[in-house]
Regions:
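Histidine/cysteine- and/or acidic
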Residues: 227, 251-254
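Short, mixed-charge, low-aromatic patches
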Residues: 198-202, 219-229, 306-309, 332-342, ...
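Conserved anion/nucleotide-ligand pocket segment
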Residues: 253-255, 259-324
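A generic structural signal for short, non-catalytic loop/turn and secondary-structure boundary residues
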Residues: 84-86, 170, 272, 344-346, ...
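Glycine-rich, aromatic-lined ligand/substrate-binding cores of catalytic
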Residues: 309-399
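Metallocofactor- and cofactor-centric catalytic cores in central/energy metabolism, strongly enriched
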Residues: 7-231, 235-247, 261-269, 362-455
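Short flexible/disordered coil segments
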Residues: 233-248, 287-298, 315-324, 342-355, ...
Length: 455
């Protein structure tokens, strides 16, 4: 793989020129109204009241460079491109338990009772619709608040009815769906997932190979709503739904929010490769006690997460190019469910490296993080960027949003980029392009080098 940071992602097909402004309010549809979703919703309302700041959100905090040479300037992302405003978001969603967003947020324990008391009214009015659930895909959960239907196609149509009613009731013309549900068991695309026709036949025939997340994704796309997959399981990543997204002109992205330990890997590993330091092994373990940890305590769901977390190092280190440095390293990933820790995830990494004359060294990382606190701003950014992509006429897989995912979906057979800094450049260069600014390149460096050359 050519690793030049100037490489651009495949630009999704444009349906029209220009970007429609974000007029009116924006609907946010969330399958899985749990800790992440309620932390997001509470946070948006608290920030609006001046009781918190949106740290972790690029759309709300980051400024990027535009121009070059003697015309360098930094502009906030939200000022560079036309984004919706947090105050314009209208939330709705599904869950397999009936508690409203305030009750769920209290049970999750991510935010203090004092903080939640200030937004109780805003949270209590958000009651989830009955969810689509299949326990064979999430074995450690039970659902009491679920939809029933004669077929999976009937369930998809029921979701479409929910979406359309939500849009009408709230006078919305635009919406985005972000999967915040639990990790489903590991699966790979099969014959049924290859074409839209075979997939729809499978919906009608109640095919076991169709997971609930795929039903949500299908319903979302059929209603013209962009879909982002925050979990490691397959949903819009199957050929049938990629085809549907392209046919309908809808933006999709995924998969698996990059929040804690994997984020740190995609920061540290590029540094090791850049310095040509060898790697003997990378041992990673986590403890977490929230519902995500409970779900991942099942081997099927854990495998989906393990595959997602394990593939980043090879992509970054390129052992095929550097077999002496990275050709034979050991990589171990584990997650342990530890209920007392709740949403406060802790990750330990032991990294055995080699330097000059093969001399051994170690790096130790102890990351005490808060899962939903890291995930909420990712969801917020994806809401705004997926809406931007849709208004800009970008359809299909949004490779430029790889920055937010552990296992980025790709529009073709290429392997995804995992280097966080390259991913960030891909994202910001897409924003520059949409703003009709020049993409960041090497021109400034080249001019500076020219000045240093003695003729």
């Amino acid at each position: 793989m050519n690793r030049s940071p100037m490489n651009k992602p495949t630009t999704p097909q444009k349906q029209s020129t220009g970007i429609a402004p974000p007029q009116g309010r924006l609907g946010v549809l969330i399958p899985g109204m749990g800790a992440v979703a309620t932390t997001l919703i509470a946070g948006v309302n608290l920030i609006a009241k001046g009781q918190g700041r949106p740290f972790g959100s690029l759309t709300q905090m980051q400024k990027i460079q535009i121009g070059h040479c003697n015309d360098l300037r930094f502009v906030a992302i939200k000022d560079l491109v036309h984004l919706a405003e947090p105050r314009d978001l209208v939330f709705g969603g599904w869950d397999i338990t009936p508690e409203n967003a305030y009750q769920t947020a209290c049970d999750a324990g991510v935010l203090s009772q004092d903080m939640l008391a200030d937004v109780r009214q805003e949270l209590e009015v958000i009651t989830p619709w009955r969810g689509v659930f299949d326990q064979s895909y999430v074995r450690n959960l039970m659902g009491s608040h679920v939809k029933t239907g004669a077929s999976k196609m009937d369930l998809a149509k029921a979701l479409m009815d929910d979406i359309r009613k939500f849009l009408v009731d709230n006078d919305l013309e635009r919406a985005v769906m972000v999967w915040c549900g639990s990790t489903e068991v590991y699966s790979e695309p099969g014959p049924l997932h290859q074409t839209l026709e075979s997939f729809e036949r499978g919906l009608r025939d109640n095919a076991a190979e169709i997971a609930p997340s795929m039903i949500y994704a299908y319903a979302s796309l059929m209603c013209g709503v962009p879909f982002a997959n925050g979990a490691p399981n397959l949903s819009t990543e199957i050929p049938a739904l990629i085809d549907l997204a392209n046919r309908k002109g809808i933006a999709i992205s995924g998969r698996d929010f990059k929040t804690g330990q994997t984020m740190m890997k995609t920061i540290i590993a590029p540094g090791l490769r850049t310095r040509m330091l060898g790697l003997e092994g990378w041992f990673s373990t986590n403890i977490i006690g929230n519902k995500d940890g409970e779900v991942l305590n099942d081997s099927g769901s854990f495998k989906a997460k393990e595959v997602s977390k394990s593939q980043v190092l090879d992509s970054i280190l390129q052992p095929d190019l550097y077999p002496e440095l990275y050709g034979d390293y050991h990589h171990k990933v584990s997650i342990d469910y530890y209920p007392p820790r709740g949403d406060n995830k802790e990750g330990w990494d032991n990294i055995d490296i080699r330097g000059w004359l093969d001399q051994p060294m170690q790096i130790k990382v102890n990351f005490l993080c808060r899962d939903s606190i890291l995930a909420a701003p990712i969801v917020l950014d994806l809401i705004f960027f997926m809406d931007l992509a849709q208004r800009a006429g970008l359809q299909g897989v949004q490779e430029w949003l790889s920055f937010y995912y552990k296992s980025p979906a790709m529009p073709d057979s290429r392997k995804p980029e995992h280097d966080l800094f390259v991913q960030h450049l891909m994202l910001t260069n897409m924003l520059r392009t949409l703003a009709e600014e020049e993409a960041l390149d090497q021109s400034d460096l080249s001019e500076n080098v020219e000045k240093l050359i003695v003729r």
